[in-house]
């Protein structure tokens, strides 16, 4: 069985785009539509990497990320943030900045797979 990626994204079309980009890989995909749902799913499944949108419904990406990194069992879990905003827009992430991989929403399939493989491939 391949490694597991959790996609935390509130927009169904972006879920579909990322899933399509990864369909020819061995990665299993878990979907969550906001940070709160992702936390519930983390109680049941442990992904090898999280792809995280920043602007979400119930719990935004920055809040989820900081909560996740505060949990000892997930502090080293790789997270790739995909957002239409830049990393500078998230002052709350300043202290963990060296550990953040930040990609634009227009990321190519090749770049996304390259970044994932560099972390868990």
Which residues are covered by each model-predicted region?
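Acidic catalytic/metal-coordinating carboxylates
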Residues: 34, 60-66
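Active-site residues of response regulator receiver
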Residues: 53
């Amino acid at each position: 069985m391949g490694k597991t990626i959790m996609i935390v994204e509130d927009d169904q079309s972006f879920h579909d785009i990322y899933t399509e980009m990864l369909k020819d890989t061995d990665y299993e995909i878990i979907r969550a539509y906001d940070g709160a749902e992702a936390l519930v799913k983390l109680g049941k499944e442990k992904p090898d990497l999280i792809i995280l949108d920043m602007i979400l419904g119930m719990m935004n990406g920055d809040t989820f990320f900081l909560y996740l990194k505060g949990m000892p069992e997930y502090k080293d879990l790789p997270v790739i943030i995909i957002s239409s905003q830049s990393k500078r827009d998230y002052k709350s992430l300043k202290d963990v900045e060296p550990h953040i991989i930040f990609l634009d929403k227009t990321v190519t399939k090749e770049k996304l797979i390259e970044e994932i493989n560099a972390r868990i491939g």
